Amino acid sequence: MNEKSFTVKNPSHEQNKRVFIDGSERNVAELPSMYIGKGVYRPGWRWSKHAGLQTGKESTRHIGYIVSGSTVIQDASGQETTVGLGDAFEIGPNHDGWVVGDEPCVALDFETR
């Protein structure tokens, strides 16, 4: 038996895409052990306004990495921090986030299966 020992996918080319009401989008690559999402969020995009409202869901825990741009994340207690280029982050459920500045925020997020 000769099973391949690797899986290669590019989230930018995957069919699992969500386009938000402002035109921002998130694609997901499904790997055997995890999901990797790539989001391109336009200036002014906000989770509660453009994702939560559209999906009817609460925000969940996110582990991610900012490829470009920046976003403010606000935790459930109201504390805020800005994450930007090169920052890795983890935030718990029931948070909000919004893009700051004139540049789209490109972020990767990781979720185990």
Predicted region positions:
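Short beta-strand segments in beta-sandwich/barrel cores
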Residues: R46, G69-Q74, G97
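A short, N-terminal "cap"/entry segment at the start of jelly-roll beta-barrel domains
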Residues: M1-V40, S48
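Ligand-binding loop in jelly-roll beta-barrel domains
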Residues: G92-R113
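Conserved short histidine dyad/triad with adjacent acidic residue
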Residues: K38-E58, E80
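Short, conserved beta-strand element in jelly-roll/cupin
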Residues: T55-I73
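Surface-exposed loop/turn positions
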Residues: P32, W45, D87, P93-H95, ...
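Short acidic-glycine-tyrosine-enriched beta hairpin
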Residues: D75-N94
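Conserved GNAT-family N-acetyltransferase fold
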Residues: G39-Y41, G64, F89
